């Protein structure tokens, strides 16, 4: 007798081994029809999976996140099937699920065209309507290699050859197409009804620029048409908000080929930078961080001690001088340990908090660069806390409060907190990991927040808390982290004198709230579609005169506002006032002041708020009060 335990606590008993699909049918015909996969004892499997012992089972449908992943993975295979039908000489390589969709890489003798994409999507629809069963077959590795070589799929054969010889591999077949895959997949192609091919791109085989350039086709797939339409609408909105376009349109910054992955900040953009940096500097000061500055370039010997030279050198910019090797720092932590080591420390000094606006450089592949979101040079609000194990929870609790206050000030209210736990490959004892993970859980419980745990996602040296912001389009951005590191202080010789007069190694907490300032500003630009709140706006007020008769008064008003700390643009051009208003409105300024004869004579100003909102005529002092209140409220 086999007992199958269901999520609602009920049980089903079967005399013989039973498939997931059969259990679903036993529960009800509706569930049997909706079933896409199953979760047996925590593992997602095909509906054809045979349950041979007492097990926990959840039936996966398109209402589950795992079900959407199965749909997308299966649609990637459907894409490859369609390409092989239309272009038999194309070779298939890999096709994983990604956020909101999937991609598949192909090798083909000519570039695919947008017209090809239309034809491929049409063929996918035809194949899906056939509702062909998707079947799984397991075979020995060498047999699988021989099979793919026999059908001319050299890339698949190469992938399988990298698998240990004693391992079996699984193949999935739908119609005439067979692919290597772990699975799981939908039971038949008819389950794939809502999908769209999005774009073409290039990708190196195995991500190595020394290898052949393949052709990557991106797609998206959903359970319901309405969900896909909402996603495509979000993409349209995201395109309008693209920080690269807005950065050029609003004269914030630019990029050019002579400096890939680096930013040329214009005066307006640099003003935004300064507002963010100054705000974060006050966060340091208000929370007892000592601001420091470590060198940009450090000797190879230090990077060897930290392990970066052996494990991260490909991502570092390296140089030589006078027969010594150096690297531009890709991160700030080793420099902070050196500052800590510059003096003898006592337990009375701990916790010791350092903060730096540290400029880092990482040699990211050119194909991975993306505006300000992925760069080669960036500055972090990077802090490190040296403390004892007993102080971890209190420090993390305090950091959490700081981070949440910062996100609220910048206009982010929807924050997901995630706890990344020990990975398979790690250093340290199980006991040290237990202590570190429980310290973070204890801190989060003390904060009264809910969180999601991510098993296996921690760094090799310690667990971390991640902060994921959702922007105005519902997109998630991982920005802040606080991470426990018991390793680096010891590798670099950091010590403190304990209560019992022995030497001990401190724990180091890596913490950042906004992370890369460049990336965070890019997120802000897209979140607000360039219409930054008053306190961040590079130009807060434009002062416009209607004619030369008001020029002197307009200058006096502008000067008055500047003296009170506002960022003001004075526009005395001899243009029609409607033209000037329209031009400054396009620049998304928070406020526009218009001055005519009436305002000049009465010593007032006519005020327009962003969005062409007419606030009427008011004295300058009243406007100043309004502006200061808005800035103080970070509204």
Curated annotation (Swiss-Prot):
Zn(2+) binds at residues 333, 384, 510. Binds 1 zinc ion per subunit. The keyword Cytoplasm applies. Residues 242-533 are annotated as: Catalytic. Its cofactor is Zn(2+). InterPro entries: aa-tRNA-synt_IIb, aa-tRNA-synth_II, aa-tRNA-synth_II/BPL/LPL, Anticodon-bd, Anticodon-bd_dom_sf, Beta-grasp_dom_sf, TGS, TGS-like. The keyword ATP-binding applies. It is found in: Cytoplasm. GO terms for biological process: threonyl-tRNA aminoacylation. GO terms for molecular function: ATP binding; metal ion binding; threonine-tRNA ligase activity; tRNA binding. Keywords: Aminoacyl-tRNA synthetase, ATP-binding, Cytoplasm, Ligase, Metal-binding, Nucleotide-binding, Protein biosynthesis, RNA-binding, tRNA-binding, Zinc. GO terms for cellular component: cytosol. It catalyses: tRNA(Thr) + L-threonine + ATP = L-threonyl-tRNA(Thr) + AMP + diphosphate + H(+). Its EC number is 6.1.1.3. SUPFAM superfamilies: Class II aaRS ABD-related, Class II aaRS and biotin synthetases, TGS-like, ThrRS/AlaRS common domain. Residues 1-61 form the TGS domain. Signal peptide: none annotated. Homodimer. Belongs to the class-II aminoacyl-tRNA synthetase family. Catalyzes the attachment of threonine to tRNA(Thr) in a two-step reaction: L-threonine is first activated by ATP to form Thr-AMP and then transferred to the acceptor end of tRNA(Thr). Also edits incorrectly charged L-seryl-tRNA(Thr). This is Threonine--tRNA ligase. It comes from Janthinobacterium sp. (strain Marseille).
């Amino acid at each position: 007798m086999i007992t199958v335990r269901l999520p609602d606590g009920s049980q089903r008993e079967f005399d013989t081994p039973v498939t997931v699909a059969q259990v679903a049918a036993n529960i009800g015909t509706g569930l049997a029809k909706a079933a896409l996969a199953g979760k047996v004892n925590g593992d997602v499997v095909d509906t054809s999976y045979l349950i041979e012992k007492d097990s926990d089972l959840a039936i996966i449908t398109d209402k589950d996140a795992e079900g959407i992943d199965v749909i997308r993975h299966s649609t990637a295979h459907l894409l490859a099937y369609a390409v092989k039908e239309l272009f038999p000489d194309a070779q298939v390589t890999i096709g994983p699920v990604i956020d909101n969709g999937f991609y598949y890489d192909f090798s083909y003798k000519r570039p695919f065209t947008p017209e090809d994409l239309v034809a491929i999507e049409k063929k996918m629809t035809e194949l899906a309507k056939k509702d062909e069963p998707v079947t799984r077959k397991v075979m020995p590795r060498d047999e699988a290699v021989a099979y793919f070589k026999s059908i001319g799929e050299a890339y698949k054969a190469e992938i399988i050859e990298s698998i240990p010889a004693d391992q079996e591999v699984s193949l999935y077949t739908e119609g005439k197409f067979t692919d290597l895959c772990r699975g799981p997949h939908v039971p038949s192609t008819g389950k794939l009804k809502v999908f769209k091919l999005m774009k073409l791109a290039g990708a190196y085989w195995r991500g190595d620029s020394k290898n052949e350039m393949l052709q990557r086709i991106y797609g998206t797939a959903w359970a319901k048409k309405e969900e896909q339409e909402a996603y495509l609408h979000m993409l349209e909105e995201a395109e309008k908000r693209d920080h690269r376009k807005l950065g050029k349109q609003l004269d914030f910054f630019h990029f050019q080929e002579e400096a890939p992955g680096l930013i040329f900040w214009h005066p307006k953009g640099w003003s935004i930078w300064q507002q963010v940096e100054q705000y974060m500097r006050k966060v340091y000061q208000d929370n007892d961080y000592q601001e420091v500055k470590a060198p940009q370039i450090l000797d190879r010997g230090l990077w060897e001690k930290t392990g970066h030279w052996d494990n991260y050198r490909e991502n570092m910019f390296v140089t030589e001088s006078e027969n010594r090797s150096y690297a531009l720092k890709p991160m700030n932590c080793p420099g902070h340990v050196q500052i800590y080591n510059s003096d003898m420390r006592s337990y009375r000094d701990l916790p010791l908090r350092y903060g730096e606006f540290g400029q880092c450089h990482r040699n990211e592949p050119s194909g991975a660069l993306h505006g300000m979101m992925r760069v080669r040079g960036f500055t972090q609000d990077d802090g490190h806390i040296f403390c004892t194990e007993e102080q971890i929870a209190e420090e993390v609790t305090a950091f959490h409060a700081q981070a949440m206050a910062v996100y609220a000030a910048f206009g982010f209210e929807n924050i997901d907190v995630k706890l990344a736990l020990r990975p398979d490959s790690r250093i340290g004892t199980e006991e040290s990991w237990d202590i570190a993970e429980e310290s973070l859980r204890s801190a989060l419980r003390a904060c009264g927040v809910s969180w999601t745990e991510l098993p296996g996602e921690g760094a090799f040296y310690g667990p971390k808390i991640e902060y994921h912001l959702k922007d105005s389009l519902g997109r998630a951005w991982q920005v802040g982290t606080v991470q426990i590191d018991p390793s680096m202080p010891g590798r670099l010789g950091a010590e403190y004198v304990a209560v019992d007069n022995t030497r001990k190694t401190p724990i180091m907490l890596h913490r950042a709230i906004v992370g890369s300032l460049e990336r965070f500003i890019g997120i802000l630009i897209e979140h607000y579609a360039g219409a930054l709140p008053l306190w961040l706006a590079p130009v807060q007020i434009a002062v416009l005169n209607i004619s030369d008769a008001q020029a002197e008064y307009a200058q006096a008003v502008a000067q008055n506002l500047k003296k009170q700390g506002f960022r003001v643009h004075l526009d005395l051009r001899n243009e029609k006032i409607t033209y000037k208003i329209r031009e400054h409105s396009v620049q998304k300024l928070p406020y526009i002041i218009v001055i005519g004869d009436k305002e000049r004579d009465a010593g007032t100003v006519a005020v327009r708020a962003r969005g062409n909102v007419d606030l009427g005529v008011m004295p300058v002092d009243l406007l100043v009060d309004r502006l200061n209140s808005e800035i103080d409220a970070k509204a």
